[in-house]
């Protein structure tokens, strides 16, 4: 506290020498005593606070400086919730035109703003307005401390909207371009703190922050790069912002791709997350590939950092959605690394993104499908199908359903004993998993020239294909009933005598088909009658709901009739 004590001594500067009132002399004497033994005093109440407040309200500039410096040192060492009586004199000092006082007062307020309760109270007491004024100062130290305080205040959710609407964003954006690295770090950190809600992100974009953030991606300072990449990643969450970015920031993607190779792990991760968010849009999905992003991402999904692996596999998952990217991703060598990611049993998010990407790639060309099988993806997915979390099972079942659509994949899947996984998956309590698995099973029963694997699995595992059909026929869920009926029709249309015999001889299957035939005939009749009445009442216009219900019932009824022709 040497600086503070020296300021409490008499100054020889004529401009600051004013008569000192008796109460001020007493305050100086008391304060010196308190500071000598400061660990034993509470400076936020009683005598110490009274002495400081007396100096704050003095007309003597030296005494005001002493108070400001004392507050700066005390608040740096002792941070806790304080009341209005403590903040009020600091806010008074903040309005001073003296740079020394401004620097110390901003520092004191910034120190106290580490505490959440203080953050709220500072803003409630009008602390933003003088801080904004100090940000406009020509003094770099004043700028740095004022922005640092705003940065701390902006970490409190209750304050963010108030800061966004206070007029602080424009000067913050201006200071982000400062040549002083400390000011720049504080300003970009404050801008980052303002990107955690959609409304605040809009205010930030409107304040012109985006071009500044993009330009600073090329900064040589890792902290500034991190703040800017993270802020842009958050801004890119919003579709409207992504549209603006695509129209105004042509170099954004190439800069982010470069940063995915940054020596700083956190910059690398945030750049990848920013690309992932941008890749929610089809235009960016193509642009990232054109900018050379694949060669970086294929390395990242094989690195040892779980956050980086997660960010990169989420990014490639979004990129793989675009059909034009599928072949390029396969050619870039992603298949085997993606299959290896399925071993992340302690991170279902990584597994989900990996399977989802594999599903997108498997659905493309014959060449990609062949490489998919050769990569070991089917076997690995089969191993995980019954033991992974529901979210992963959902992706795996969807992947199987897509693969089973291709005629030239069906026998390969059956030879891989895929039914060992698919049939038990139809038992899942999760409708999406059960439905996807059933759809895959139905597709595998359609248009194949060898039904040996289907026949072998008629009763096993888990009561086999037969058990699946009975459960779905009796599910009273139209989608599942439709899948079961369509599967039976495909099996019958194969004209395989063994298959026909297995279905005809199963009384429960035949009984369930007849029941669905009767129910859907009756439902179609009722829907048709309602349809006619509604036409009469409404003068020809009909509610679409009754019409759709009639069509659905008719479709199920028609399938049952086609099946009955085979059975009779």
Curated annotation (Swiss-Prot):
- UniProt xrefs under Pfam families: Arm
| Ranges for the ARM repeats | 37-74, 75-114, 116-155, 157-196, 198-237, 241-280, 282-321, 323-363, 407-446
GO cellular component terms, A-Z: fungal-type vacuole membrane; membrane raft; Myo2p-Vac17p-Vac8p transport complex; nuclear membrane; nucleus-vacuole junction; phagophore assembly site
S-palmitoyl cysteine lipid attachment residues: 4-5, 7
List residues with covalent lipid attachment of type N-myristoyl glycine: 2
Note the Gene3D superfamilies from the entry. Answer: Leucine-rich Repeat Variant
Q: Which GO terms describe its molecular function?
A: identical protein binding; protein-membrane adaptor activity
Instruction: Indicate whether Lipoprotein appears among the record's keywords.
Output: yes
Q: What topology does the record note for this protein and the membrane?
A: Lipid-anchor
> What InterPro entries does this protein's entry cite?
ARM-like, ARM-type_fold, Armadillo, Vac8
Give the location in the cell: Vacuole membrane
Q: Which GO terms describe its biological process?
A: autophagosome assembly; Cvt vesicle assembly; establishment of organelle localization; nucleus-vacuole junction assembly; pexophagy; piecemeal microautophagy of the nucleus; protein localization to membrane raft; protein localization to phagophore assembly site
Which keywords does this chain's UniProt record carry?
Lipoprotein, Membrane, Myristate, Palmitate, Repeat, Vacuole
The keyword Lipoprotein appears for this protein: yes
The role this protein plays is: Functions in both vacuole inheritance and protein targeting from the cytoplasm to vacuole.
Which family does the record claim for this protein? Belongs to the beta-catenin family.
Protein name, as recorded:
Vacuolar protein 8
Record the organism: Eremothecium gossypii (strain ATCC 10895 / CBS 109.51 / FGSC 9923 / NRRL Y-1056) (Yeast)
Gene giving rise to this polypeptide: VAC8
């Amino acid at each position: 506290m040497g600086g503070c004590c020296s300021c409490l001594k008499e100054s020889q500067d004529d401009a600051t020498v004013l008569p000192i009132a008796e109460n001020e002399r007493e305050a100086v004497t008391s304060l010196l005593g308190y500071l000598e033994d400061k660990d034993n005093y509470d400076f936020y109440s009683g005598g110490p606070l009274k002495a400081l407040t007396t100096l704050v309200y003095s007309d003597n500039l030296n005494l005001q400086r002493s108070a400001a410096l004392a507050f700066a040192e005390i608040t740096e060492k002792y941070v806790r919730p304080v009341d209005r009586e403590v903040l009020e004199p600091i806010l008074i000092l903040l309005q001073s035109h003296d740079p020394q006082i401004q620097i110390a007062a901003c520092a004191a307020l910034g120190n106290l703003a580490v505490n959440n309760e203080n953050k709220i109270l500072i803003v409630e007491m009008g602390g933003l307005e003088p801080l904004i004024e100090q940000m406009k100062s020509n003094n770099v130290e004043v700028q740095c401390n004022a922005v640092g305080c705003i940065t701390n205040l902006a970490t409190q959710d209750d304050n963010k909207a108030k800061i966004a609407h206070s007029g602080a964003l424009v000067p913050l954006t201006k200071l982000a371009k400062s040549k002083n690295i400390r000011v720049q770090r504080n300003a970009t950190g404050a801008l980052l703190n303002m990107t955690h809600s959609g409304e605040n992100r809009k205010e930030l974009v409107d304040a012109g922050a985006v071009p500044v953030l993009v330009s600073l991606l090329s900064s040589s300072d890792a902290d500034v790069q991190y703040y800017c990449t993270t802020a842009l990643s958050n801004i890119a969450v919003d579709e409207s912002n992504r549209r603006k970015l695509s129209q105004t920031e042509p170099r954004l993607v190439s800069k982010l791709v470069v940063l995915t190779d940054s020596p700083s792990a956190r910059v690398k991760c945030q750049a990848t997350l920013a690309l992932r968010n941008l890749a929610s849009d089809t235009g960016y999905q193509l642009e990232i590939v054109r900018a050379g992003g694949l060669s970086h991402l294929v390395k990242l999904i094989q690195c040892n950092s779980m956050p980086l692996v997660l960010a990169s596999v989420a990014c490639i998952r979004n990129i793989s959605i675009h059909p034009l990217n599928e072949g390029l991703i396969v050619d870039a060598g992603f298949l085997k690394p993606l299959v290896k990611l399925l071993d992340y049993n302690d991170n279902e998010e990584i597994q989900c993104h990996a399977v989802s990407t594999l599903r997108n790639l498997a659905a493309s060309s014959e060449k990609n499908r062949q490489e998919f099988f050769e990569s070991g993806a089917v076997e690995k997915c089969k191993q995980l199908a019954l033991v992974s979390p529901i979210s992963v099972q959902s992706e795996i079942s969807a992947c199987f359903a897509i693969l089973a659509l291709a005629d030239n994949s069906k026998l390969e899947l059956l030879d891989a004993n895929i039914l060992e996984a698919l049939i038990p998956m139809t038992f899942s309590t999760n409708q999406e998993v059960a439905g996807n698995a059933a759809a895959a099973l139905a597709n595998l029963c359609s248009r194949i020239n060898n039904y040996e694997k289907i026949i072998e699995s008629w009763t096993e595992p888990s009561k086999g294909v037969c058990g699946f059909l009975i459960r779905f026929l009796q599910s009273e869920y139209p989608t599942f009933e439709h899948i079961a009926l369509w599967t039976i029709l495909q099996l019958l249309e194969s004209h395989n005598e063994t298959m026909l015999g297995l279905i005809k001889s199963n009384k429960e299957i035949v009984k369930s088909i007849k029941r669905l035939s009767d129910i859907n005939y009756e439902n179609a009749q009722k829907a048709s009658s309602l349809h006619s009445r509604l036409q009469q009442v409404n003068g020809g216009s009909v509610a679409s709901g009754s019409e759709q219900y009639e069509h659905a019932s008719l479709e199920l009824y028609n399938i049952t009739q086609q099946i009955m022709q085979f059975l009779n």
